[in-house]
Amino acid sequence: MKKLFILAGPTAVGKTDISIEVAKKIDGEIISADSMQIYKYMNIGSAKITKGEMQEIPHYLIDIIDPKENFNVSRYKNLAEKTIEDIYSRNKFPMLVGGTGLYINSLICNYDFTDAKVDVNYRNYLENLAKVQGREYVHSLLKDIDAVSYERLYPNDLKRVVRALEVHKLTGKTIGEFNSKDSLYDIPYKIYYFVLNMDRVKLYERINKRVDLMIEQGLIDEVKNLRSMGYTKDMQSMKGIGYKELIRYLEGDISLDEAVYLIKKGSRNYAKRQLTWFRKDERVIWVNKDEFTSNKEIVNYIINTLVTC
């Protein structure tokens, strides 16, 4: 089975430096799993890695999408899978690095982003059947094909009843089998999934300092430039943290101090949500940075863990 290394963690925890050092040791090439770094021109606000910071380690899925485009997880999965195969073809170790949990899960969970698991016509048929013969009748259809759902779901819970029937028609599986962890983790990779974390107070301090640094580096001018290029607040890309707040400032809706406050608050809340997301996956190997004295120690721990896995 092909190997896939993952290094994730909340914003500002310090994934970049560690990923570079790991890549040097395992002959790795890095695929970004960041929903903002994928956009062109949005460099400061996304904390996009620079050429110098890459230290000649190849990086992919950075700076490739125009900000006017709507980009989704299905497109990401498609691009990332092709990139992984390309890296394998050169006998290198693919490394997925970033903090966008949904992007990561698109590759390490058995998600289906096609319409193959949806049958709109059958769904409409069942909903019409419920109107004609009653919800109890539609619910009774579960009895012989999915006894567990039949007992668990009430007839009035039509949406879930219909979904259970639809899944069985399309897959031959009960909804429980379809959603099982065995099915969810049925992927073509052997994964090594590390998530960095640190004391929350320290993390929030790092986030606040990073936002201040972004302002010093010219984030306001970056947003002004994006607007002059025709990118508007209604676009998906411009709704990212740091961009939407500064647009409000430039439009005169809030002061700069208020904008910076909101960016810091939004970033801290995002970090909290990221950690909640990563905790849901039992495959994660947690790396608490507070338990190490240096990044070198962390890298050595990761490498030693890779060897023993």
UniProtKB/Swiss-Prot annotation:
Record-given protein name: tRNA dimethylallyltransferase
Q: Which reaction does it catalyse?
A: adenosine(37) in tRNA + dimethylallyl diphosphate = N(6)-dimethylallyladenosine(37) in tRNA + diphosphate
Site annotation Interaction with substrate tRNA: residues: T100, R123
Matching Gene3D superfamilies, A to Z? 1.10.20.140, P-loop containing nucleotide triphosphate hydrolases
> What is one GO biological process annotated to this record?
tRNA modification
Which residues span the membrane? none
Region Interaction with substrate tRNA: start-end pairs: 34-37
What family name appears in the similarity comment?
Answer: Belongs to the IPP transferase family.
Q: Which UniProt keywords apply?
A: ATP-binding, Magnesium, Nucleotide-binding, Transferase, tRNA processing
Role noted for this protein: Catalyzes the transfer of a dimethylallyl group onto the adenine at position 37 in tRNAs that read codons beginning with uridine, leading to the formation of N6-(dimethylallyl)adenosine (i(6)A).
Q: Which cofactor does it need?
A: Mg(2+)
tRNA processing: present as a keyword of the record?
A: yes
Please provide, alphabetically and separated by semicolons, the GO molecular function terms listed in this UniProt record.
ATP binding; tRNA dimethylallyltransferase activity
Q: Which species?
A: Clostridium kluyveri (strain ATCC 8527 / DSM 555 / NBRC 12016 / NCIMB 10680 / K1)
Residues annotated as binding ATP are G9, P10, T11, A12, V13, G14, K15, T16
Q: What is its EC number?
A: 2.5.1.75
Under Pfam families, the record lists: IPPT
Which proteins does it associate with, and in what oligomeric form? Monomer.
4Fe-4S is among the record's keywords: no
